[in-house]
Amino acid sequence: MLAAFISRVLRRVAQKSARRVLVASRNSSNDATFEIKKCDLYLLEEGPPVTTVLTRAEGLKYYRMMLTVRRMELKADQLYKQKFIRGFCHLCDGQEACCVGLEAGINPSDHVITSYRAHGVCYTRGLSVRSILAELTGRRGGCAKGKGGSMHMYTKNFYGGNGIVGAQGPLGAGIALACKYKGNDEICLTLYGDGAANQGQIAEAFNMAALWKLPCVFICENNLYGMGTSTERAAASPDYYKRGNFIPGLKVDGMDVLCVREATKFAANYCRSGKGPILMELQTYRYHGHSMSDPGVSYRTREEIQEVRSKRDPIIILQDRMVNSKLATVEELKEIGAEVRKEIDDAAQFATTDPEPHLEELGHHIYSSDSSFEVRGANPWIKFKSVS
């Protein structure tokens, strides 16, 4: 179904000019300049640029990454319904421009922490599809050895996946404090949703980050619904980019990977200059419900979802740009689609056949190093044994 959808889209792109993309100029055979939406600003005299250059290599990379995240999430949906995945599972299809654009705007040595809707960020931070799907199915080959599941995945310079709404806010500020304490040039992206924006601990993190001028980019992924509650019903002020009060803010088109990239570069440079934290609101949209137990159509209409798919889909926006600026051909994008499909299928095969972890694995990685003391007379390294 997805393959047919993409094929129709690519044929349409090839037959007529892009509706949503303005090509400012064509520099060479390997890059093109595009106009992007201007960001709304708060406590800032100037913001990110309104034009940006996209190279062919960058465009192909972003397209592959966004398509991989989309298909990975759809495969996770399938595996959940087949009962290979149990427990909580929050999908981010529709929000691919956020995770890909954010990663494109920072360095690998920078740090990222996010909420439980973490699969896309896990992938863009460097985890393989195989290790992500295997973690979802609770297998040994998962990035957390099958013990973390959907909400608790980790890799180098990525700190999860956090199950408590808004809890990553203070943690992100703490990571930024470590960066400042060490005196390096690194920053921390701290992501949270529009629902978490109403949590008190987010405001507390704002306060300490501003007080100590921490290199922290607070990022509100506003997908318009906190679980099943719209932003208009939950927030006295839905202008989340102004919620920092004394922290400058940007409102960004979160459905445009280039807009997210340029805004992230701007915010990262702001933090690296020693000015303290900055707040970004990414206006985005999730196609699935809040979680797998939420059909996602009781508080919004199917027509609303379809309108976003047809007019603002982040993958289609990039496809339009690539094809109409001749940075890529329809055939090239189809080939990438076939390669991504195979990668996802192979990863799913691994995730459903790899062995589950041994029971005693539950007792591992509780302490960072061997404990030289006893806790209330108990040996903390006693292996868990089956009661059967």
UniProtKB/Swiss-Prot annotation:
It catalyses: N(6)-[(R)-lipoyl]-L-lysyl-[protein] + pyruvate + H(+) = N(6)-[(R)-S(8)-acetyldihydrolipoyl]-L-lysyl-[protein] + CO2. It is found in: Mitochondrion matrix. Changing S293D: Abolishes enzyme activity. Increases neuronal cell death in response to glutamate excitotoxicity. Pyruvate dehydrogenase activity is inhibited by phosphorylation of PDHA2; it is reactivated by dephosphorylation. Pyruvate binds at H90, Y116, R117, G163, V165, D194, G195, A196, N223, Y225. Gene3D superfamilies: 3.40.50.970. Its EC number is 1.2.4.1. It is linked to Spermatogenic failure 70: An autosomal recessive male infertility disorder characterized by azoospermia, sperm immotility or necrozoospermia. Hypospermatogenesis and meiotic arrest have also been observed. The pyruvate dehydrogenase complex catalyzes the overall conversion of pyruvate to acetyl-CoA and CO(2), and thereby links the glycolytic pathway to the tricarboxylic cycle. This is Pyruvate dehydrogenase E1 component subunit alpha, testis-specific form, mitochondrial. It comes from Homo sapiens (Human).
